[in-house]
Amino acid sequence: YNNPQFIVAVNARYELLNKAVSSNFFNTTHFAWLDFSASHIVKFPEDNILTPEVDDRIRAAWIARFNRQKKTFLFNHKAIAGGLLIGHKETIPELTSQHRQSFNKLLSLGHCINDDRLLFAMLEQNPQLFHSSVCGYRSVIERLSRPLTIEN
């Protein structure tokens, strides 16, 4: 994240996702962004199916560990895995609009922008937009393939 071109390229995914929703070439209700380069850290199980939730919120992975018995975090990375997002065609434009505004504001202040941390800040400011699941980076796909147990 010390390379300005890398920061711009990573954050450009949201505009590409927005363009996909606008064109809706396959006439679908839900869209997903998946970074295939994430395989260096994310486990890609065979025959795994990602499905959207019943509601229209953005389905995302909150990078943290949660102890259900103690109802406390073992650690909280305060990041959303931006490499895998699933959302409804009506919700994605809201996500991308908020991302654009937040990204441009931080950029104008001269900040180095980590998209995973920016998404977490967006989650804190707009919890109604997200349906998040607590997990580690390695298990993102497996976790988002199962019904969610911790939500906002």
Task: Describe the function of each predicted region.
Residues 38-40, 74-152:
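Catalytic core and acceptor-binding pocket of nucleotide-sugar-dependent glycosyltransferases
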Residues 17, 48-50, 119-120:
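Short amphipathic alpha-helical segments and helix-helix/interface helices
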Residues 1-25:
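Active-site-proximal specificity loops/subdomain of glycosyltransferases
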Residues 18-27, 61-81, 86, 92-94:
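A structural preference for long, well-packed, hydrophobic secondary-structure segments
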Residues 23-26, 30, 38-71:
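Conserved donor-nucleotide/metal-binding helix-loop-beta segment in metal-dependent transferases, i.e.
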